[in-house]
């Protein structure tokens, strides 16, 4: 092979100089700044911005709900089903079984109320007329809500205790996922109290409409539910722990405000494999809404 002269390397040297010049000139900031060598987390930053925006918008929504003058009536249909199991049957619940044990007895109760809520200024009242009990017609005015183990008052204001501007300072929030509720895209927000308290002790997860930031659903954390007592049944083949699932769905909309369509409470025992035994189911369905006032109160 013949020898190469120095002149033959000139084109290669020129090319290398051009590439080095272009590299340093086009990317000077990124590679000359040592902090750019550290890994970035764009997803985390993006999620925090999204969360901050959601909290601002839902705070505005809750202020609207809180300051609304309301007067409406609807039908409130309550079904309470209690399933009684022998303790021995529960403790021998097979981990390999595809179905839970059958109850030895079932008790069913049902009530239909004419429900009325009136809110004017700071005055808030709810009234019930019992129309039916276990299939028998009734007409009892100003009755107390028939005893069920778990129920909430003033459910339309549930979002306020989670996301109003005042209560936001008492919670820590994070985006827990995304979902679809009744065909509407939603962001799931997990709320956790900064400190334990007696007032407004509930916390859990909230489904927020991506479009208008109204509240589509609330799921209460069992540990925040009053009358809930943690219980553990010990078994040689696996322990059973009692849990309570409580969700409120806001399926009716009027003047930009959402009203409850259903409350569903389920008390269950769950084994180590995630298999469930239903002990009690309470469903409250709201229908036939009639609105007389839904307006923002003007404050001077």
Language model features: what each stretch is:
Residues 4-6, 19, 41-42, 46:
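Compositionally biased regions
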Residues 38-203, 210-216, 221-244, 252-300:
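Structured extracytoplasmic
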Residues 6-7, 17, 33-36:
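Intrinsically disordered, low-complexity polyampholyte segments enriched for Lys and acidic residues
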Residues 18-33:
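Bacterial N-terminal signal peptides
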Residues 1-14:
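N-terminal secretory signal peptides that target proteins for export/translocation
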């Amino acid at each position: 092979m013949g020898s190469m002269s120095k002149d033959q390397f000139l084109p290669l040297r020129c090319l290398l100089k051009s590439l080095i010049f272009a590299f340093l000139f086009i990317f000077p900031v990124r590679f000359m700044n040592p902090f750019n060598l550290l890994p970035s987390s764009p997803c985390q930053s993006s999620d925090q911005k999204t969360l901050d925006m959601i909290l601002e918008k839902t705070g505005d929504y809750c202020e609207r709900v809180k300051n609304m003058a309301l007067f409406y009536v609807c039908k409130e249909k309550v079904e309470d089903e209690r399933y009684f199991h022998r303790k021995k049957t529960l403790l021998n619940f097979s981990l390999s079984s595809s179905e839970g044990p059958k109850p030895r007895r079932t008790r069913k109760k049902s009530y239909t109320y004419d429900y009325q809520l009136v809110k004017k200024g700071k005055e808030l009242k709810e009234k019930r007329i019992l129309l039916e009990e276990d299939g028998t017609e009734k007409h009892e005015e100003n009755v107390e809500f028939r005893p069920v183990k778990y129920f909430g008052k003033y459910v339309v204001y549930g979002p306020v205790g989670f996301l109003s501007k005042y209560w936001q300072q008492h919670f820590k929030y994070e985006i827990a996922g995304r979902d679809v509720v009744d065909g509407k895209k939603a962001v799931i927000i997990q709320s956790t109290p900064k400190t334990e308290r007696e007032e407004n002790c509930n916390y859990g997860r909230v489904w927020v409409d991506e479009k208008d930031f109204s509240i589509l659903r609330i799921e209460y954390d069992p540990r925040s539910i009053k009358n809930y007592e943690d219980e553990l049944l010990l078994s040689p083949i696996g322990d059973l722990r009692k849990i309570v699932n409580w969700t409120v769905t806001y399926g009716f909309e009027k003047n930009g405000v959402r009203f409850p369509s259903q409350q569903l409470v389920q008390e269950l025992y769950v084994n180590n494999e995630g298999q469930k035994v239903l002990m009690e189911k309470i469903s409250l369905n709201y229908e036939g809404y009639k609105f007389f006032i839904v307006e923002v109160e003007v404050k001077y």
